Regions:
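A cross-kingdom marker of C-terminal helix-rich interaction/assembly modules
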Residues: 1-40, 44-235
Length: 235
């Protein structure tokens, strides 16, 4: 399950980076993909957290499965498949209940709580504003774009930098959890991937992206006028 969440997060971040290659960054698209990536990474951290044993990881996985069925309505065509998967986990936990006896019941916190726990930075808030259609964010961003402020490009860079930082944190956790050999992982990744990369190059990219993102001040890309108007004039 940890691996599944990392793969999903990587897919979202790769798609996010693709939006930056165009002539105009898509401000809502990058935020939505970024938020998806960070939420997946928070679940990977929840399962791979240091200080818990394998029984607790299994219990947390089962809890995630049980919680996940809430998003599959009985009227949905894939509900039966999802429910069958959950039932398999329920039966597994029931058959092995003695092994898990005495463990404190696990609860899965909301995404925002998990993200704040494992990635305590304001980046998630920035991702959530456009995802939820925050009126203030939309107004300031559109005005900035109309005035040539480049808000979408700056927000997209900040989104990617934050996601890369979260990805590195999650990968570090997994490396320690599974005692992985980074060199072996690099070789496997380069065999499977289109472009050769090293872990050090990923860290350097993360650091450079964070440096660029942190170099911008709000006044460089956001328009804080007294009376924001969608057409850039006062009514």
């Amino acid at each position: 399950m940890i691996r599944f969440h990392l793969l999903s997060a990587g897919d979202a971040i790769y798609s996010l980076s693709g939006l930056l290659r165009g002539s105009s960054a898509l401000r809502v698209g990058t935020a939505t993909l970024g938020r998806t990536a960070v939420e997946h990474l928070s679940r990977a951290m929840f399962l791979g957290e240091s200080g818990i044993n394998y029984r607790q990881r299994i219990q947390r996985t089962a809890t995630l499965m049980e919680k996940g069925i809430n998003e599959y309505r009985p009227s949905m065509p894939d509900h039966a498949i999802a429910n069958s998967l959950v039932q398999q986990w329920t039966h597994f936990m029931a058959r092995n209940r003695l092994e898990f006896k005495g463990l404190k019941a696990e609860k899965v916190s909301q995404y925002s709580v998990l993200v704040e726990k494992y990635f305590p930075k304001i980046g998630y808030v920035e991702l959530s504003r456009p995802t939820h259609g925050n009126a203030i964010w939309v107004t300031l961003t559109v005005i900035s774009e109309q005035q040539g402020g480049g808000a979408s490009r700056v927000y997209a860079l900040r989104n990617l930098a934050y996601c890369l930082d979260c990805l590195v944190t999650a990968c570090d956790t997994v490396v320690q959890l599974w005692s992985l050999d980074i060199a072996a992982v690099e070789r496997q990744a380069n065999d499977d991937g289109p472009e050769p990369m090293t872990w050090n190059s990923v860290l350097q990219l993360r650091d450079s992206m964070l440096e660029i993102a942190e170099s911008f001040e709000p006044r460089d890309y956001a328009d804080f006028v007294d009376n924001p108007h969608p057409y850039g004039t006062s009514s």
